[in-house]
């Protein structure tokens, strides 16, 4: 039995990290009785341990709540939880496409942050009704009136009806639910039209295969229907249709406006593409739903198993993660130093760290990662254009006319005391200043054009340390621009180690090369012969360190005696070392590859 459309409300919660979004979701679940007190844990919707530990939401969750409103009517509210981090903007846009309204949660002490803004603009693009909620009013440092003014001045929303709440104590929960019913429009859509459903997420279950989460836009879907995925053309028979209350519960059918999941023994993860449209195989919809794009990775790095025989396990693990995470891409890669592995593409650095951690935790893999790199556009002397995401794939310098790198427009919000250090950091990172806005007497928004390569290197860490953790950052891709870029190779014992190569700006090559060789000198164990470590651009060495040889004390047996006797023994040792150097090889320990990532940060 499906619910009448006028009693359905689909909404999501948008907020900056740590403004209390997951806790507010907990209160809504508790208030509507979706979970008993016994089942309640903090941050119910953050199902991964990793999400709880880092205090961030990565995967989307969709929950159906039943709420009896003050008008005596029972409503069905579908809460679609969204991640707030800049790397996951695409996931946010998918959730927003499945809703009609959004709760904008702002911390009463901190005010508006960069990512709040970015997500609000996305919500406005999707024409959502936005309900401002000022959270954490129980804090001694809360200033709800200042935040209310900020919402009006910065975003331009009418905040006179903003709801004051405290997700921790549960104040304002009922007002929020009433506001959703009063202000969010019910879904529109014809239950009898051909089926059109938007996939906004999918998970992989080892028993039931790939399970898409979707919002029905037109028509209805029942158990036993034959469905087709419009992007891939694959067809399946539906075994089960259900909703989350947060635990999965089967239902007869889902009609236009409702949110739920289906299982259809879908073996291949690639069939349930996020953003694809599900339609009926017998009576297909004329066109797929709009607003869907294939998501492009921004950051690439190599992942190699420490034990090369676990290569197949790594591939299986990546395929399973890719199911849950449409934005992860990978292809095989071989490296002279590291053997077989994968070149993986991510949305950003946080996304990269999370995937690595999940591979290590959930699949028990030990990994070596190479330094992250962005996608460069290389224009050849013959006019050809190639995209390079791996420094080893860069053509020879005489074949390159110029190299272009991706630039982003970054918005940095910071307390006004830190404007100086932030501007200094942006200058160091080759940024160009665009403009500066005072949001209130204490807070400033700075806009800069910055190369993406600098942001993925260590920009975020530096920004946090220079502003004592107060600044927040959001960025969007602007396009490509020519830059003075060079490829820097690292040679150990006169042999290039391909996994340590990187593309860097000419002005920073020396500092980066110097930092790297010094770091490697500390990490590579001493051999029985001298080992030179060099950083080189082309054939020109720009920095060098030498690891001195381990030497046996050959003079231990000589007590006194003539100096020529000692000299003879030392010369003989030296000769042996020389021969050894010609045939010796140096094993580079795993820590050395990790060092490349940290070389710029120390």
Curated annotation (Swiss-Prot):
Q: Which SMART domains match?
A: EFG_C
Subcellular location per the Swiss-Prot or TrEMBL entry: Cell membrane
GO cellular component: a single term: plasma membrane
User: Which CDD domains does this UniProt record tie to the protein?
Assistant: EF4_II (cd03699), EF4_III (cd16260), LepA (cd01890), lepA_C (cd03709)
Q: Which HAMAP family match?
A: LepA
Q: What does this protein do?
A: Required for accurate and efficient protein synthesis under certain stress conditions. May act as a fidelity factor of the translation reaction, by catalyzing a one-codon backward translocation of tRNAs on improperly translocated ribosomes. Back-translocation proceeds from a post-translocation (POST) complex to a pre-translocation (PRE) complex, thus giving elongation factor G a second chance to translocate the tRNAs correctly. Binds to ribosomes in a GTP-dependent manner.
Official protein name in the record: Elongation factor 4
Native organism is: Moorella thermoacetica (strain ATCC 39073 / JCM 9320)
